[in-house]
């Protein structure tokens, strides 16, 4: 998707959006996740109103039902995993408009405490085992990347798909020895059930980004709102990067609402192990000046994984659904750029 940036920049002005003239924007996400925290922070700080937006939130337990809901226009923009983002591009024409974070270390294969050491010493012993996970998710991608690292194929194990809550329940009750989880569910299993990470996406050399997405129809009709949405999200990360203690306190409240309770140490681990991108960082990883951008490469690798698993027939061209147009709109608008980069 290619847009005339200069023509659109004029549409993105903070001055034209006083607090009393807010435009509704439907935002979707998955609750109690690190990359969704900026939505909560921005709401608590009142930053949406500063750009003339009024968010209406909808939440989903995982990416597949989330992207399916876009077909009925129940949401306009949001955050999701990279695997559902690619699937959403193929099935529902969703655009990837930025990244939420690098969650390569936050998606992993875990084993129960009684079995973990054995699997770590001899990964080949996983052959023939059952792994419970959420299919077509970043957790699924991480698990299968780990299997490939050990020379194992999907056909070498039995995969049972279920929601993350069911994965936690199955492993906690010793009805499953191996499970694919994403943070903070990883920390819940470690702290409450003594499970251990035996391999993360990062360990397997897989880059697992989170994606900021938009319905293509909405993005075409309301490009200025998409840019403002991104600016609010970026400002929240910028603020959190310089206010760790307050951010952790807000994370605790946000996670509590989503039914997740983890230690302060694990909450800090979320910040320490999951890099995020400011405006300059987003533009850098989305820059196609060379032979394709980093984001193109990462998402195409994920698409190739999905094709190999039979989830979709072909790998979609990255340029068809990944666009930095809206990040560029922010960069071209002095007021919106200053807003996105504000750390206080």
Task: Please give the residue ranges for each predicted region.
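Bacterial N-terminal signal peptides that target proteins for export
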Residues: 1-8
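Hydrophobic helical h-region of N-terminal Sec-dependent signal peptides
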Residues: 8-16
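Sec/Tat signal peptide C-region and signal peptidase I cleavage site
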Residues: 17-21
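Short, glycine-/small- and polar/acidic-enriched structural segments
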Residues: 22-163, 170, 177-183, 198-200, ...
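Soluble non-cytosolic domains of exported or imported proteins
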Residues: 61-64, 79, 133, 137-138, ...
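Conserved C-terminal helix/tail region of periplasmic/extracytoplasmic solute-binding proteins
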Residues: 296-344
